[in-house]
Amino acid sequence: MKLNKAFLTLGLAAALLQMPASSFAQTAGGNRQNPLLTKSSLPFGAPDFSKIQESDYLPAIEVAIKEQRANIQKIVNNKKKPNFQNTILAYEESGALLEKVTNIFFGLTSAHKTPGIAETEKKATPLLTELDNEISFNKKLFERIKYVYDNEYKKLKGEDKRLTEVIYKSFVRSGALLSAEKMERMKQINSRISELQQEWGNLLPAATNNAVVWVNSKEELAGLSDADIAQCKKDAESRGGKAPYCIVIINTTQQPILTNLQNRELRKKVYMASIHRADGTNPKFNTFPIVTEIAKLRAEKGKLMGYANYADYSLEKTMAKNSKNVDDFLKQLIKEYAPKADAETKAIEAYAQKTEGKDFKLQPYDRFYYSAKMKKEILNITDDEIKPYFNIDSVQVNGVFYAAHRVYGLNFKQRKDIPTYHPDMKVFEVSDKNGKPIALFYSDYFRRPTKRGGAWMSAFAKQSKQRGQLPIIYNVCNNAKAPEGQPSLITWDEVTTLFHEFGHALHGILSDCKYNTLSGTAVARDFVEMPSQFNESFASIPEIFDHYARHTETGAAMPADLKERMLKSISFQTAYSLGENLAATCLDLAWHKISEDEVPSPYMAGAFEKEELHNIGLLNTQIPPRYSTSYFNHVWGGGYAAGYYSYLWTEVLAVNIADYFAKHGALDPAVGQAFRDKILSRGNTKDQMEMFTDFTGMEKPDASGFLKARGL
């Protein structure tokens, strides 16, 4: 279950009258109001980062926890017969202050984790877990919720009915129907998992930062562009300067920098640093003890809840429903993928042998390098040739925003008057086709040491008509920032990442739901990635592409020949990306389909990974998992346990949606409006398969288009 179910409906004056003394934080000059506990004067109620101090977060969380406890107690002590208003809605509204505070705080724990934020997280996490357990296992509260579900549910309509169902089932899935003994054990499991995930969240970024590869001379970086070399120098300086240059490891197994790095020994060092970052090769950085304990606890949790394993427990609330359906889906993809993967690997090795000799054996750290050379020879194209056309500012404004304008009628105006938590962050006011403001959107695109790897979307405030709250949404990425005065140029993969994350953002921006719990991206895990993956399709539509792909110095459009070669390169050797995702997906499921007794020791965790990949035919040193067990943050630190398959599952949905748009008008505002009305605005107010059918007319997703798009 999630915390933070509610929003204060009291006016500001009433709220201040009730505000306890701890809502005021000490400063050198005396007492000051904690800005996290007062109403923001900024547009949309945006967080005022010019006033918020790191020392404000913990006191605000403590006050908000106290308030939610009091609100829950009011529900429990209510002598009136339980009904939607005094129980379901009261519960929905019980923790809005806590949600407001933690939405802001947890935005920083991922994107700007300073030592102060890390220390606050360490103190706040057990407090929040304790509250979550208190609420999830509050017998009297659940009795009231169950009474409404049993006696009033069938009479309710629309979102009131859906909210009642979602809240009731979330309590059941948290263990509300368990015996007292099992309930107590579930509390212990939840608390321990929370502690372990906090340990993971501190250890993995430290391991990744430690895994940088120091480089003594510019000559060793031969093959890299001047911009990349400058970035290596900048990264070295920001990390203490042990050597003139350093190569920073990103969150995935393979490292994009290997594409151009000529020095084979250095390529090997970078790759080895990546795969061994957290497996205990350096004893200070070993996540396997955390992994195996979490796996044991999850297996026990699934068993306590009456399921064969944790995967089946986790998947019950998804479109897939159970692990067998996911296995069947993956087997179809593996069957189609395996021959193509073998053929691609042989082709790359044969190409490399033309220059390196017939005895040359392709290694995983060679693959990107020789694949890129092969692609250049066949298609006559390199990243360095196309990057000047992908200025990140143009991609955002003239690509991502322009597509949203064409399809959904949205307009974007930068708001430099709204403060942010870091100078790199930008704020935009989003308005509809009639000029009515509907959301704020923040973008934080550049990497820094305080930011975890990857790219994501979240919200400082979710949309809710009940609360009168418009959405405040943000995207975070990890692009390299150019030196001062120079444009930041990105690769095609990074272009699609911007479109992808903004697809998530649109799911939040265009939300039009009554209740916070149901709004925006609060949908099944194997549906939530569909809007983002679908939004990637706009990146290559000619009218959109030509609008943003302009040379950063001349402003000229990308020449037709170069554009054609670039678009062809997108489908060049596609087996790798599918294979690395399949391997990671199957690895995730393997860890969550085993019983407690089958979980290996930390020492044997690496061997378990290899054995499981071998058993399903995916132990391929040439195509390693996108994330290996020891640094698989989605699974051990995020919300994707037994759910990483959803990226492939939703790609099938996204291709079906894109095919519908292509057939009926890819940039037709009427089609965009229908997609907005039937899916993007609906949140979790309706079963997601029904939404999919309502829009496409298809009874179920069809994987044939996905396979074709992957060249299978």
Q: Where would I find each of the regions flagged by the language model?
A:
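Boundary at the C-terminal end of the N-terminal hydrophobic targeting segment
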Residues: 23-25
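Bacterial N-terminal signal peptides
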Residues: 9-19
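Active-site-proximal, well-structured secondary-structure segments within enzyme catalytic domains
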Residues: 163, 195, 202, 207-248, ...
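N-terminal helix-rich structural modules
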Residues: 27-232, 246, 661
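C-terminal, non-catalytic "cap/extension" segments appended to globular domains
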Residues: 29-51, 63, 222, 244-246, ...
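Short pre-active-site segment immediately N-terminal to the catalytic Zn-binding motif
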Residues: 480-499
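Short His/Asp/Glu-rich catalytic/ion-coordination signatures at enzyme active sites or charged loops
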Residues: 41-56, 105-124, 146-188, 248-289, ...
